[in-house]
Each structure stands twice: as structure tokens, then as C-alpha cells.
């Protein structure tokens, strides 16, 4: 828990409107995470751009974002934290409808709130997304199958690495 009963989700909700407007083009704010790793709290701001981000990019973004976080009143952070600006990596989260639209044609992993045909996690190629339903092809043992998933049933989605 954070100060004054704020949850981690609330902390992220407080930080997002401060950070999002200052992320310059061509960068995209992918996600903000706040978690305790070992004995330290870490605020991770995941950014990307079409050609990928560099160490210099993360340093420049840190110089922009860090002073702004210190201006949030009242201070939403329960303790000292480390600020981490990084790439979302190969298995970047797909948290918005737009990120799913951009992922059409890519190999993804989708976790559901409720099972479809006794399956709660699908991994395969996202063949279509219309804003309301995802269409995926996946391998069930040795058989290629297709599944249609209502967007509202998606608990979590991310790009996946095909092995």
C-alpha cells in the first residue's frame, strides 16, 4: 500500500498524466509499473519508438521525467524508489486496443478472465482485431486451430517469442 491508502494502481494512475504529455515524438509510452523488487521499490516507465530505444534515449527521458515526478503533491510514493526508463523488450505488453491493432500479424500470448473451450491462455498468431474481437491461429498439439476471443475477456496480452 502507498501513503494515504493509495494502491499501486492508483499510484500509476497519478503518475501517468504527469509523464504521458512529456514523452516526445517519436517515443510511445507503453506502460508504467510500480513494484517492490527485493527490498527496493521500482517505478518502471516503458517506452519505445519504431527503431528501438538507445541508452542515450533512456538517459534523455530520465532527465525529462525525474524532476516532474518530484513535483507531484502530495507525494504518492510510500518510500524512496528507483526510476527505471526502459524498453518493453521482446515480450512487450499489449495493454490498449491500439497496441493490439498494431500487433496483428505478430505472435502473441493472451490470458483470459474466463476459459474458452477449457483454455485460459492462448499463444499464437493474431490474425485480426476489430476493436471488439481478436482472431488467433494457434497450435493445439499438432493441429492448427483458430479461436475468436471477445476483447472484454482479455485479462492480459503481450507479444511472445516463438520458439
Curated annotation (Swiss-Prot):
Annotated localization: Cytoplasm
UniProt xrefs under HAMAP family = RimP
Task: Give the transmembrane region(s).
Answer: none
User: In this entry, which stretches build a coiled coil?
Assistant: none
Q: Does the keyword Cytoplasm apply?
A: yes
Instruction: Work out whether the entry's keyword set contains tRNA-binding.
Output: no
The superkingdom of the source organism is Bacteria
Name the GO cellular-component terms. cytosol
Q: What are the protein's UniProt keywords?
A: Cytoplasm, Ribosome biogenesis
Organism of origin:
Streptococcus mutans serotype c (strain ATCC 700610 / UA159)
Q: What is this protein called?
A: Ribosome maturation factor RimP
Functional note:
Required for maturation of 30S ribosomal subunits.
Give the family from UniProt.
Belongs to the RimP family.
PANTHER family (alphabetical)? RIBOSOME MATURATION FACTOR RIMP (PTHR33867:SF1)
Record GO biological process: ribosomal small subunit assembly; translation
Q: Which InterPro entries match?
A: Ribosome_maturation_RimP, RimP_C, RimP_C_sf, RimP_N, RimP_N_sf
Amino acid at each position: 500500500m502507498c501513503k494515504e491508502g493509495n494502491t499501486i494502481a492508483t499510484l500509476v494512475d497519478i503518475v501517468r498524466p504527469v509523464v504521458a504529455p512529456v514523452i516526445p515524438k517519436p517515443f510511445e509510452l507503453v506502460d508504467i509499473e510500480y513494484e517492490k523488487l527485493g527490498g527496493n521499490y521500482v517505478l518502471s516507465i516503458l517506452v519505445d519508438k519504431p527503431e528501438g530505444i538507445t541508452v542515450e534515449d533512456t538517459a534523455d527521458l530520465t532527465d525529462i521525467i525525474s524532476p516532474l515526478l518530484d513535483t507531484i503533491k502530495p507525494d504518492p510514493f510510500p518510500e524512496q524508489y528507483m526510476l527505471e526508463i526502459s524498453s518493453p523488450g521482446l515480450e512487450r505488453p499489449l495493454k490498449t486496443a491500439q497496441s493490439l491493432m498494431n500487433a496483428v500479424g505478430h505472435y502473441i500470448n493472451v490470458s483470459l478472465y474466463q476459459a474458452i473451450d477449457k483454455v485460459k491462455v492462448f499463444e499464437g498468431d493474431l490474425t485480426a482485431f476489430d476493436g471488439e474481437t481478436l482472431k488467433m491461429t494457434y497450435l493445439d498439439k499438432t493441429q492448427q486451430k483458430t479461436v475468436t476471443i471477445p476483447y472484454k475477456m482479455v485479462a492480459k496480452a503481450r507479444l511472445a517469442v516463438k520458439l
